[in-house]
Amino acid sequence: MVYFENHNKEPDLAEIHYIPHNVEETHWFLDEIEASNFKWAFNVAHGHLVPEGWSGFLDTFGVDKIGQVRVNDNSGEYEIHLIPGEGTIDFPWLFERVESSGYQGWYNLGFGNQTDKIRIRNWFETLITE
């Protein structure tokens, strides 16, 4: 399986500029590549950094091509892998949107240490089952 991630925009003076970082650039790939082993690694925190927000990605692409949801938090200002709840992403709304859209895949926890991941996983489980 190949997982394709929406990235974060780097500052203009950065040495590297990733694509795709917004909805428009993500279309270039998700609309053109039709392969059963090509899935979208939906990075919620990266989506939180663009004007469309992470919900703009879901509004545009839905969940059908998602192979995994990558989860961490940030303030919406710049890329940093905060523990969920330490930034400004609305995780109850995120899980409501993703799960009610029919997503049945897995979530990748990209933050903190093992203890943090277990604690936050337990919190996320309560959000999904409410």
Positions of predicted regions on the chain:
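Glycine/proline-rich, flexible active-site/cofactor-binding loop segments
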Residues: M1-E5
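Active-site-proximal beta-alpha loop/turn segments in soluble metabolic enzymes
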Residues: N6-H17
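Histidine-acidic metal/acid-base catalytic patches
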Residues: A14, P20-E130
